[in-house]
Amino acid sequence: MKLYKVLNSKTTDKSLCLEVEIDPNYWQATQKKLVGEMAKSIKIKGFRPGKIPPNLASQSINKAELMQKSAQNVMNSIYESVQQEEIVASNDNVIDDYPTIDFKTITEQNCVLLFYFDLIPNFQLPDYKKIKDLTPLTKLTEAEFNNEIEKLAKTKSTMVDVSDKKLANGDIAIIDFTGIVDNKKLASASAQNYELTIGSNSFIKGFETGLIAMKVNQKKTLALTFPSDYHVKELQSKPVTFEVVLKAIKKLEFTPMDETNFKSFLPEQFQSFTSLKAFKSYFHKLMENKKQETILQENNQKIRQFLLTNTKLPFLPEALIKLEANRLLKLQQSQAEQYKIPFEKLLSASNITLTELQDRNIKEAKENVTFALVMKKIADIEKIKVDNNKIKAEIENVIAVEYPFASDEMKKQLFFNMEQQKEFVESIIINRLTTTKIVSYSTH
């Protein structure tokens, strides 16, 4: 027996409203059942608790409370079924999470509910094909991979003094330097006994290359310019003079990794590799994934900024904002649990109230929802779809990279667990493919 029927539906710019009538017999049976439950707590002189006649108990029960509890019961019973109604489930613009529920009629005889489902807004996309300064997606080069292997080898390195030589690329320069802007010493651009690896590009352009071939105790003045995107706004594009003294030159010496010693360089989680070849094969895949993920994240942030700045939505679905704000709060609470810190104590230490945090989360949720809606529309226009084969390949790749030594049985369990989050995995793949597509327009 169906517990309800849809009497009517109405669509506006922002919502789809379903008028739902609860089956009268079910509605009255729900009230009768609750009268019996509520009667157990009623006290009437001359009757033992729970032994009050139904007609007398019904007269003593708070009618408003009975209606409220009955309505909540039937809403819980029909909620998922209403979400699966054809008019809701078949419309991609309907957000079936968190509908607002109101009463049209509620009496002892019948109950009519109104389910308001938010709709995805209609909006104009900005020209996402012309976003500037995106980085092309490139494969891991042999030089990059060898550099990563060298970094591992350098964990067992020793520093030796080579102050009798001229400063070269790759050396560690021990320097005193003073930055001068507008004839004034700049404390934030000055230091003593600073260790600078030449070629690290950790200083502004021209600084490190300007020191090459210097000798110990030599002084040098560098006339440079802060970049236009320098992190200190007041210094962007400003001329700066650096007075530098080279105090010492050092170099890292290390033993190259080979088949006989490679395990001594590896972290504990990699100790099960039995050959350098097997480790390098895995490590190459790990570094390839890391490079691609880094480029994608950098591009994604630039794309996000462009889309948020240049997209105007007529409204944002409250259901999605609520869903995302709740997700952010749960994430913050789980992080506190991870560090075994009571959430209230973490809020106090951060000098923020729960209300202030929730307001901040709502602001972030609005940006996240806007970005997600715009990316979804781009994915639809570009006909980006993900089938089960792609989801399977993604899960298998994650397991291969994150759990290289898992047994076959454990891999099966991991696959099963991740497959239960199929929608989440699908959203990650679609976001990656959409980002990649936008980058392809920008870099060609």
Curated annotation (Swiss-Prot):
Molecular-function annotations in GO: peptidyl-prolyl cis-trans isomerase activity; protein folding chaperone; ribosome binding
Outline the extent of the PPIase FKBP-type domain. 170-255
The subcellular localization recorded is:
Cytoplasm
Q: Which Pfam families match?
A: FKBP_C (PF00254), Trigger_C (PF05698), Trigger_N (PF05697)
Any single Gene Ontology cellular-component annotation: cytoplasm
Q: Which SUPFAM superfamilies match?
A: FKBP-like, Triger factor/SurA peptide-binding domain-like, Trigger factor ribosome-binding domain
Q: Which NCBIfam families match?
A: tig
According to the UniProt entry, the note on domains is:
Consists of 3 domains; the N-terminus binds the ribosome, the middle domain has PPIase activity, while the C-terminus has intrinsic chaperone activity on its own.
The molecule here is called Trigger factor
